[in-house]
């Protein structure tokens, strides 16, 4: 099923084109309804992207992709790229480091810290656990 469409105020076009990763609740039409964790196609002027909807947070939308609908392989690519980017840290004799930096690694709201053989995963958006369904 295609994601729902959401038309946002045109004044958001410039900040979103500049790479701002969030849309705040105040900027979302009040009548919009979806379950948390739903991928939404957003538009603001000529800007278009796929974003993750959070029905509870003041950060209502986290922009995930301006090119394609995120999928399992899309998420795996972001995780792999973050792993490769941290190769210098991994090659040193450290036993703890941050693997995923959320928005900085293209996975808004997801932070992963490694401590030895253990990973601590923090999800900062309601419904983000649904990412596993992609």
Listing of model-derived features with the role each one plays in the protein:
Residues 1-134:
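RNA-binding accessory domains that recognize and position tRNA/RNA substrates
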């Amino acid at each position: 099923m295609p994601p729902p469409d959401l038309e946002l105020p045109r004044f958001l076009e410039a900040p979103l084109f500049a790479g701002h990763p969030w849309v705040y609740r105040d900027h979302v039409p009040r009548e919009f309804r979806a379950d948390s964790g739903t991928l939404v196609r957003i538009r603001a002027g000529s800007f278009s992207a796929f974003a993750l909807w959070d029905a509870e947070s003041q950060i209502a939308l986290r922009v995930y992709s301006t090119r394609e609908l995120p999928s399992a392989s899309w998420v795996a690519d972001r995780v792999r790229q973050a792993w490769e980017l941290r190769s210098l840290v991994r090659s040193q004799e450290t036993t703890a480091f941050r693997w995923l930096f959320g928005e900085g690694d293209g996975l808004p709201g997801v932070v992963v810290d490694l401590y030895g053989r253990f990973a601590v995963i923090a999800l900062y958006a309601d419904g983000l656990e649904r990412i596993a369904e992609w």
